[in-house]
UniProtKB/Swiss-Prot annotation:
Signal peptide: none annotated. It comes from Lactococcus lactis subsp. cremoris (strain MG1363). This is UPF0291 protein llmg_1475. GO terms for cellular component: cytoplasm. Belongs to the UPF0291 family. It is found in: Cytoplasm.
Amino acid sequence: MTITNEQVERINELARKKKAEGLSEAELEEQALLRRAYLDSVKANFRSQVETIKVIDEKTGEDVTPDKLKEIQRKNGMRD
């Protein structure tokens, strides 16, 4: 799930309002939902990036990618 620029702007708007004057209960709930969506998006993007990494030993040139990561990559069709 990706978060839109409008959602990020709304998160920032609510943060500014909270600091300046406080938020209503509805706004607090909206802020919590938007923040959760934002964090879920960041986590998904980070996981996607990590799952495509291949670790190579500089000295030997061997693939030293952890087995757990290799298994995930195989499940996603990125390894033999």
